[in-house]
Amino acid sequence: MKRTSSLFSQIVDYENLRLAWLKARKGKNSKKSVQNFSRNVNKNLQVIHDRMIASPPVLSKYIQFKIYDPKERMISVVPFPDRVMHHAIMNVLEPVFERQFIFHTYACRKGKGTHAAARYAFKCAGRSEFFLKLDVRKYFDSIDHTVLKQFLCRIIKDARCLEL
């Protein structure tokens, strides 16, 4: 497995941050936080840049709230500036991770997703009238961060990038 370096400078590059802002606001232009950020976009992108290059990087706390759809769930979201950071990171890391995935990995990938996964599952299952719908309880909360970080270290050797 080839390890990738010198990613941090690409992530914090101003043009990448601007692209990240455009992606993060897509479909959310009516939100007050997006409008406020966009009013002073250059200044706010500089603040994000400064937060990212600080060691350790300055991150905001998650905002949590409950929804009932159809059962009670706790939702965690980050403030809009951190969302821009996430997009900046993924703009650079997505191609790195795409090379690691097997073809039939469907979640959160361009041109894939739940509909493509369902089509493939139906194709494999033939004409079966039965299916299994499941929800892994507290899946993201149960991910072992030590194991995840070890996996990331095998792919990424840029220490500054790993701090993010």
Question: What positions do the PLM features span?
Answer:
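Non-catalytic, polymerase-adjacent accessory regions of viral genome-replication enzymes
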Residues: 1-46
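Generic recognition of stable, solvent-exposed alpha-helical segments in well-folded globular domains
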Residues: 2, 12, 43, 83-84, ...
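Charged boundary/loop elements
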Residues: 3, 25, 94-103
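Short, conserved non-catalytic motifs in the polymerase core
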Residues: 27-36, 60-87, 100-112, 132-133
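Conserved polymerase palm-domain catalytic core
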Residues: 44, 51-52, 70, 103-104, ...
